[in-house]
Amino acid sequence: MKIYEGKLTAEGLKVGIIVSRFNEFITSKLLAGSIDCLKRHGAKEDNIEVCWVPGAFEIPVIAKKMASKGKYDAVICLGAVIRGATPHFDYVSSEVSKGVAHVSLDKEVPVIFGVLTTDTIEQAIERAGTKAGNKGYDAAMSAIEMSNLMKVLD
């Protein structure tokens, strides 16, 4: 039996990161977590490129653009969608997750879903670097592992 796994080294990896400007007080912490993870695992700062978009809904189209270029080993998508009093949360959360998954499958590039979908601001803050860890860091770990696994399987 053969078992395949991706290494947890970012040396030589080129990573694109897309960050939603909406809820920037949260997303900037997710971005910092992603960059910290990539650098701790050997990525060079010159191999990390960041695109800011207005909101989470705009993430998939830029993910598609970045994944289509063929220069990124992975694309990390970061955002924070927080439930409000209207159904807007449900529409945005659903479409962003579908869009990100579609791009990854279509382009065969790891496109990592690091978009927080929380009921409260407090939950988002917890997931952006306090008691629930930093989901931006976690998304970068997934990007590293998946990028290396894709290389093993090529």
From Swiss-Prot:
Listed GO CC annotations: cytosol; riboflavin synthase complex
GO biological process, one term: riboflavin biosynthetic process
Domain of life: Bacteria
EC main group: transferase
UniProt keyword Heme present: no
Residue positions of the active site: 88
Binding of (2S)-2-hydroxy-3-oxobutyl phosphate, residues: 85-86, 127
Positions of transmembrane segments: none
Keywords of the record: Riboflavin biosynthesis, Transferase
InterPro entries: LS, LS/RS, LS/RS_sf
Pathway note: Cofactor biosynthesis; riboflavin biosynthesis; riboflavin from 2-hydroxy-3-oxobutyl phosphate and 5-amino-6-(D-ribitylamino)uracil: step 1/2
GO molecular function: 6,7-dimethyl-8-ribityllumazine synthase activity
PANTHER family: 6,7-DIMETHYL-8-RIBITYLLUMAZINE SYNTHASE (PTHR21058:SF0), 6,7-DIMETHYL-8-RIBITYLLUMAZINE SYNTHASE DMRL SYNTHASE LUMAZINE SYNTHASE (PTHR21058)
Stored HAMAP family: Lumazine_synth
Record's protein name: 6,7-dimethyl-8-ribityllumazine synthase
Gene that specifies this protein: ribH
